[in-house]
A protein has these predicted regions:
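Active-site helix-to-loop segments that bind/position phosphate- or nucleotide-bearing substrates
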Residues: 92
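Generic solvent-exposed, charged/amphipathic alpha-helical segments
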Residues: 7, 11, 110-114, 147
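An extended, acidic, His-containing surface patch that forms the Zn2+-binding/catalytic region
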Residues: 20-79, 83-87, 102-108, 116, ...
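Structural beta->alpha junctions
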Residues: 96-100
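A short core secondary-structure module
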Residues: 1-18
């Protein structure tokens, strides 16, 4: 049954603690703000989420590879009948820390899939799009000036988080303009941000403060 084969392969990606079981993948070593468990559960909308006694939530969230199943093609529930399923497929997303080579990661993912095929079933691995990430240096002049503006306008210390580094165009920018600084900033609703979702939300006052910070920084360096 193709669905059972697919289920076994998907189950092989993680162990009982939710740790990724694909051999050969690497993590990124850098300093980021440590998220508190209570904040993360509030952000995810549930106090019942099992975080598996993770040593560092921030490292696992931002600096290690993560895999999820985006979609599965198989008979829908409404059309299901009591027959053996002849074929099934899934689209897998493997999010990488910015220092991981996507070519290497794709090969490791394929090797894992092919090593975990049950019952001598026929399985085809089809690579899709991939992109390289980048690590932005927070100690460069423009970045430090921008952080000073953030601190002043928000009246709070800036926290560094590990997001955006796997966006492929960021690496393209660094490659094309090696002497330029890369700073990834954005505005979001702290309670209802829902990035990438249909109901993604931003706080208007945060957008205004972000613009003010950028303007102040440009004035300071001009």
């Amino acid at each position: 049954d193709a669905f059972m084969v697919l289920s076994r392969i998907i189950a092989s990606f993680h162990n009982e603690k939710g740790e990724l079981m694909i051999e050969g993948l690497t993590s990124t070593d850098m300093q980021v703000t440590e998220l508190e468990e209570s904040f993360l559960k509030k952000m995810l909308g549930s106090d019942e989420i099992n975080l598996f006694d993770t040593e560092s939530i921030s490292k696992r969230l931002w600096l290690e590879p993560a895999l999820d199943v985006l979609a599965i093609d198989a008979p829908p529930v409404k059309e299901a009948v009591n027959l053996v399923i002849p074929k099934a497929s899934a689209k897998i997303s493997l999010r990488l820390p910015p220092t991981e080579d996507p070519e290497h990661a794709m090969k490791m993912l394929e090797d894992h899939v092919m090593k975990n095929i049950p019952w001598n079933a026929f399985v085809k691995f089809i690579p899709n799009s991939k992109g390289s990430g980048v690590v932005a240096d927070p100690n460069k002049p423009f970045t430090k000036e921008l952080v000073n503006s953030f601190n002043s306008i928000w009246e709070n210390d800036t926290a560094y988080i590990g997001v955006g580094g796997s966006i492929p165009f960021a690496n393209d920018f660094v490659r094309e303009f090696p002497n330029a600084e890369l700073v990834l900033v954005g505005a979001a609703d702290e309670e209802l941000g829902n990035a990438h979702a249909p109901n993604e939300s931003v706080q208007i006052d945060h957008i205004e403060m972000l613009i003010e910070s950028l303007v102040q920084t440009l004035k300071n360096i001009s």
